[in-house]
Amino acid sequence: MWRAGSMSAELGVGCALRAVNERVQQAVARRPRDLPAIQPRLVAVSKTKPADMVIEAYGHGQRTFGENYVQELLEKASNPKILSLCPEIKWHFIGHLQKQNVNKLMAVPNLFMLETVDSVKLADKVNSSWQRKGSPERLKVMVQINTSGEESKHGLPPSETIAIVEHINAKCPNLEFVGLMTIGSFGHDLSQGPNPDFQLLLSLREELCKKLNIPADQVELSMGMSADFQHAVEVGSTNVRIGSTIFGERDYSKKPTPDKCAADVKAPLEVAQEH
């Protein structure tokens, strides 16, 4: 049984990374032939982990890292050792982003992608903030969809997918829409068939591409975490977010203050974005 955190704890970050990458490639080989031939990206989720572990993973070839909290990402990405030793690092923000934290996120060094745009207002705020930053490149963004319909999870209803992508493409010239992201429900029993949340995201991409005349290989799917990344890749994920399987179990006693208001009723369940 593949248990999140066990491989890293026993063999170290380098061996854990190799094992995860091997499992990703095995899953790619099992994909249906009709899926877009996009090589999956491994996002190593380093939340609650020290900068030295990021540097260690970077030394073993990992380049893309993800964080859930703006303050932790800003501190880690600004760490002098990371800036010096990891010049090609790419940071993904994968947590819920409140509008009051947008400017802080845009200041993160080497920010590569925001995976969790979940409203038109947030897209507009990110667009204007990125413009003020003066970057020559557009910021890559994904739209987060609440495929499971759970109130505890953030993301747009599936029915609003096309409208927000149209808005980003037409009204947010500083953003580059690159895909759809979901967390989905946890603990799906694969003996009952494919994860319905993953299947829904696949169907949303198909509908989106058809209506907006976008090639399918230009719309990524970010789905799959430590517990289900192989299945996610098998059915079409192009971006898996894996943390404890690489870095070991997390110590949440050292977790920074979440980037949210006390009034945000979804906050206590935010750690469910796990990865």
Swiss-Prot record:
GO terms for cellular component: cytoplasm; cytosol; mitochondrion. Keywords: Disease variant, Epilepsy, Phosphoprotein, Pyridoxal phosphate. It comes from the Eukaryota. The modification N6-(pyridoxal phosphate)lysine is found at K47. Residues 251-275 are annotated as: Disordered. The modification N6-succinyllysine is found at K125. One of its GO terms (molecular function) is pyridoxal phosphate binding. Belongs to the pyridoxal phosphate-binding protein YggS/PROSC family. GO terms for biological process: vitamin B6 metabolic process. NCBIfam families: YggS family pyridoxal phosphate-dependent enzyme. The keyword Aminoacyl-tRNA synthetase does not apply. Pyridoxal 5'-phosphate (PLP)-binding protein, which may be involved in intracellular homeostatic regulation of pyridoxal 5'-phosphate (PLP), the active form of vitamin B6. It comes from Homo sapiens. Ubiquitous. This is Pyridoxal phosphate homeostasis protein. The modification Phosphoserine is found at S6, S226, S244. InterPro entries: Ala_racemase_N (IPR001608), PLP-binding_barrel (IPR029066), PyrdxlP_homeostasis (IPR011078). The gene is PLPBP. It is linked to Epilepsy, early-onset, 1, vitamin B6-dependent: An autosomal recessive neurologic disorder characterized by seizures responsive to treatment with activated vitamin B6 and/or pyridoxine. Most patients show delayed psychomotor development, intellectual disability and learning disability. Seizures onset is in the first days or months of life. The modification Phosphotyrosine is found at Y69. Residues 251-263 have a biased composition (Basic and acidic residues).
